[in-house]
């Protein structure tokens, strides 16, 4: 059983993930924001548990992903750390420290390691901040560097950004070469893993072949990469929008939750004992 394997296996390390690439074994990453989910995904045998700054939009109802602060990310990461025993724990930088320069980025990385016990830090838009990647890597902190196709890079190379999200997209050779170059520079700066956003089946394999470190993808990724990253809540269909408009996921937890809470309401209204409450003796 997967959980039996996960509970007896040795902790996942960066070295182990890099060996998985060399062996041709796919890497699995899941985004988690709380202690309960962390325990479950760790038991399932994922390789990476990533604490995403997407917690603001998906769990707290923020309208802007930039609202999440460093202190908030530390609180969330500490909770996830308590639930993860085997998988490698990564955390997203919130907006701010990376943009403030290498010194600020290094201070933030050190805080995540010292205060939250992370194994790796993830830098969004890392291709624009190679000095920060290098500074953190020199300090001995593993860096998970995100890069990829953005509306800006698509426009620069004369293509429609939305077209790059299709599985059969054919990217201009100049854009593929640009992305390969970014990946190589991030590897040279000291990144130990890459998160390639909107890789597609053309640039994705090219980047995978160009670097020795694992290339993982969430949005716009596919089996052409060394592994995949998925939000835990998305994988199980846990979003209010999924009640009326369910997506193709591995479960429909939002619908199950609605049915369960509706049943709870019915039991209370009808004067019945609720499930999981203190048993009531029948007279």
Residue ranges and their predicted role:
Residues 2-283:
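Alpha/beta enzyme core
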């Amino acid at each position: 059983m997967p959980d039996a394997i996960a509970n007896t296996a040795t902790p996942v390390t960066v070295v182990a993930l890099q060996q998985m690439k060399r062996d041709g074994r796919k890497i699995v990453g899941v985004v988690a924001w709380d202690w309960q989910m962390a325990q479950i995904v760790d038991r399932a045998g994922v390789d990476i548990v990533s604490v995403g700054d997407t917690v603001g939009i998906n769990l707290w109802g923020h309208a802007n992903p930039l609202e999440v602060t460093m202190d908030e990310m530390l609180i969330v990461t500490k909770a996830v750390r308590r639930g993860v025993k085997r998988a490698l724990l990564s955390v997203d930088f919130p907006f701010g420290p990376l943009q403030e320069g290498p010194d600020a980025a290094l201070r933030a990385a050190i805080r995540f390691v010292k205060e939250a016990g992370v194994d790796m830090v993830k830098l969004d838009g890392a291709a624009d901040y190679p000095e920060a990647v290098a500074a953190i890597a020199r300090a001995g902190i593993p860096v998970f560097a995100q890069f990829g196709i953005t509306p800006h890079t698509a426009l620069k190379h004369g293509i429609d950004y939305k077209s790059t999200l299709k599985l059969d997209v054919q990217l201009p050779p100049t854009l593929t070469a640009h992305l390969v170059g970014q990946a190589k520079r991030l590897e040279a700066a000291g990144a130990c893993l890459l998160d390639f956003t909107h890789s597609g089946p053309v640039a994705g394999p090219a980047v995978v072949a160009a670097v020795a470190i694992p290339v993982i993808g969430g949005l716009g990724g596919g089996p052409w990469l060394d592994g995949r990253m998925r939000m835990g809540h998305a994988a199980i269909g846990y979003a209010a929008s999924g009640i009326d408009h369910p997506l193709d996921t591995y479960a429909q937890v939002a619908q199950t939750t609605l049915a369960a809470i509706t049943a709870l309401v019915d039991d209370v209204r009808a004067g019945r004992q609720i499930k999981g409450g203190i048993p009531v003796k029948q007279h």
